[in-house]
């Protein structure tokens, strides 16, 4: 079974889940391919989340992990410093400069925070 974006994010957030149930939940969701659907599933797992669009100049203000829309796809950002970023895209982890990431990123993110119920 291929890992999906939400299982990658849940691992980074240390959220308990089963791969089978999460996969079934995603497959049955009408908005499984966009941030709205991801937000609904995160809420089901008691992960607080909020979709925002920010200026690329403010990327360093974000706390990883989070979901971002980049390269016409959805990615999970694992680590972020002023100069480097590490993110999961197209089934692999990529490390690049923040500047290079900002060239493919449109400024849209889904910020996440776990709770005691997550």
Residue ranges and their predicted role:
Residues 2, 32-61:
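Contiguous, structured surface segment used for ligand recognition
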Residues 2-13, 18, 26-33, 59-75, ...:
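Noncatalytic regulatory segments and standalone regulatory/sensor domains
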Residues 21:
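Acidic/histidine-rich, surface-exposed loop or edge segments in extracytoplasmic proteins
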């Amino acid at each position: 079974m291929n890992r999906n974006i939400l299982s990658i994010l849940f691992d980074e957030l240390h959220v308990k889940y089963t791969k089978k149930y999460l996969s079934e939940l995603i497959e049955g969701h009408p908005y499984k391919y966009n941030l709205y659907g991801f937000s609904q599933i995160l809420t089901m797992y008691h992960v607080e989340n909020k979709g925002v669009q920010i200026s690329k100049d403010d990327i360093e203000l974000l706390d990883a992990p989070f979901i971002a829309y980049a390269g016409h796809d959805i990615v999970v950002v694992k680590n972020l410093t002023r100069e480097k970023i590490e993110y999961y895209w197209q089934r692999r982890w990529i490390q690049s400069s923040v500047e290079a990431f900002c060239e493919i990123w449109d400024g849209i993110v889904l910020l996440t925070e776990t709770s005691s119920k997550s």
